[in-house]
């Protein structure tokens, strides 16, 4: 989890904590080491090596004829995507997602041409290294959904790359089929080494935010997923068996899946600061291989959106025995927050947005209302606790005056706790409902930046709810400002911050509880936090800031309604009645009694120290 997300959690915690006081108080094989992961420069160099430089059949054997040819292209496609295949290396040359565009409203290509490279390393019978990228494949068959590319090694000896699409599916089946090549390859070759590289294009308007969510992700064969660091260059040697390796952007991914397992991998993620690309990922890995085995080696590529429900569906279809768990590509937070998103937020959001011409702004409003209604009992309980503390304020002030001075601090606290016990008030009661709401706020904080349903959806002045909206934008380089604010001001973020200040002001006008006296800096902190949140959330999705805005406005409305419904004079009368009853029958309140007893012992210890 990156530091910006952690900072976000801290900000949310402090806002909730402050309002609580205001309202109450985780060995690469030798061959892999010889063939390290491909960088863009090395790939360009390798592809630019003319085949004419190497003519000797001593190196290529019966594959030598396939080193000569002309690169041609063939296309397979369905309603969702178009894949161009190259006869040079038999690789996927480009992938276009038909239903999506980039932030410039141009066709969305995950990669094209030399932005990606793919190579399989074979060992010939005379122990020479053969790279699939050096050969020209023959087009054996081609239909709209399937293409067979063949690497010939003489009469009736070949290796086929079979690419298959399915209607309305982002998953590509890829089979490596060997036929009568036992005499062409080394019998000591027990693994196939694979190299894969891809540059990640900038697809979204908010580059820095997109960089934060672009991560090289991989899944262990029988375990959970892990990621390389997203904020800087990272290289990792993974000796464990892997199930898949994913090149993830904020909203789209390229995932390489093997039906058996990857033996190990060297993974490399490079952070590209400028230009049309944000990251460069490369992998050097291997899979088990038996030259005598005539069964096809099966793989899959997933080229598509990071849609939680779509990715989850692959574990319920023909790939369910693979236990892919591709949905974990979507960052939804740690276990508790992820559970809230999986079980509550995502189902409600999908239900609200299921249909044509859905207004996403209205959907977010309804989602906010549903969450607020679900949390209403906790909110009301917190308000009542705050009201009790407020009506007891005069009596608490009398205790403070009667037992003023540092030497009587323990007596003062003891008498205050005794008052709370007598009237049946626990000063901590108001904190618990606020704290119980925190997981929902953090879950939503994680959900909105990952919600592809918001992408390119407009609402009011925001053209795209998945990125920041722009009230003011500038190109002038202002010292220090871009680091903290970017080159724009988000109107939704500004309104959210103003609403938070209004909420703070409204509460501080009426809340006069002990917390403000014990923590005199808390009031200033609560006014300062919306300013900090403005700088922090200014580049976050407009959908998230819109949610925070209406959530804060609803909170203000709730507080106004609660004040009108709760008669503080009647509430004080009930507390006084409880006080009279407590003088007749001493009632144990658990926490309050333990706190009072602790203070009494502290007072006795203090007296003993003074006598010494």
Swiss-Prot record:
It comes from Azobacteroides pseudotrichonymphae genomovar. CFP2. GO terms for cellular component: plasma membrane. This is Membrane protein insertase YidC. InterPro entries: Membr_insert_YidC, Membr_insert_YidC_N, YidC/ALB3/OXA1/COX18, YidC/Oxa/ALB_C, YidC_ALB_C, YidC_periplasmic_sf. It is a multi-pass membrane protein. GO terms for biological process: protein insertion into membrane; protein transport. PANTHER family: CYTOCHROME C OXIDASE ASSEMBLY PROTEIN COX18, MITOCHONDRIAL, OXA1. It is found in: Cell inner membrane. Required for the insertion and/or proper folding and/or complex formation of integral membrane proteins into the membrane. Involved in integration of membrane proteins that insert both dependently and independently of the Sec translocase complex, as well as at least some lipoproteins. Aids folding of multispanning membrane proteins. Interacts with the Sec translocase complex via SecD. Specifically interacts with transmembrane segments of nascent integral membrane proteins during membrane integration. The keyword Chaperone applies. One of its GO terms (molecular function) is membrane insertase activity. The gene is yidC. CDD domains: 5TM_YidC_Alb3, EcYidC-like_peri.
